[in-house]
Amino acid sequence: MKFSQKQEIELSAILNRRLGFDDISTENRKMPVCVCVDSSYSMSEDSLLGSPRIEEAKKGVRKLISFMSSDRALRNMTDVCVITYNGNGIVNLTGGFVPAKEAADMDFSFDTFVESPIFTAVDKAVDMVNAQRDGYKKGSISAERGWVILITDGRADDYFCKNGMISVNVRSKLEKNKKNVRLVCGCFGYETKQLDKLTTPDNIRNMEEFSGIYSYFTMLSQSLSVASRAI
């Protein structure tokens, strides 16, 4: 289902009223969100929507951050970090975790290169979220469950790293940290065989089934909003 801007605003207002957010304080609560964007060459290919996947991903990430910076709960409690990954390594586009409203003013450049180290990127993202949560706790701030949002076409080039054990090790890390970190995967198309090694199928969605990546990120934004209020 694709939402119009008006529908998104109305849905957010309904959530505010039904969940009674006006009576909830987020001053002493923080939720880290790390967005990992695949920037391998294959992401330069056109999606079913007719434009390069990497451009669709960029628009979607901007939409997500814009929502977080305007949503009453998320703008106060969410710190966001955007990283890209390819054969050149992992690039931190936000310079670490920053308030959503600050990230909304940033301009991101997703430069593509060979290879797609998906498992390495997720491993790094989990460590980053945990480190951010530890920082909250040291500052006497309530550290809520963080999110790792993976955007990819599902083609991992580091699958056989460490004698084929990298997927096992990363999934084990996610399992051990499931109370602290949630992983969700947005995939261009149905090439999810390798992603299945990371998480359960219900955490993997084909973004092209949502009548456009905007609709996927709208759904994701609403999920974050509900999570922030349900804590």
Please provide the spans of the model-predicted regions.
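C-terminal helix of von Willebrand factor
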Residues: 199-231
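Acidic, polar low-complexity linker/tail segments
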Residues: 1-34, 40-50, 133-138
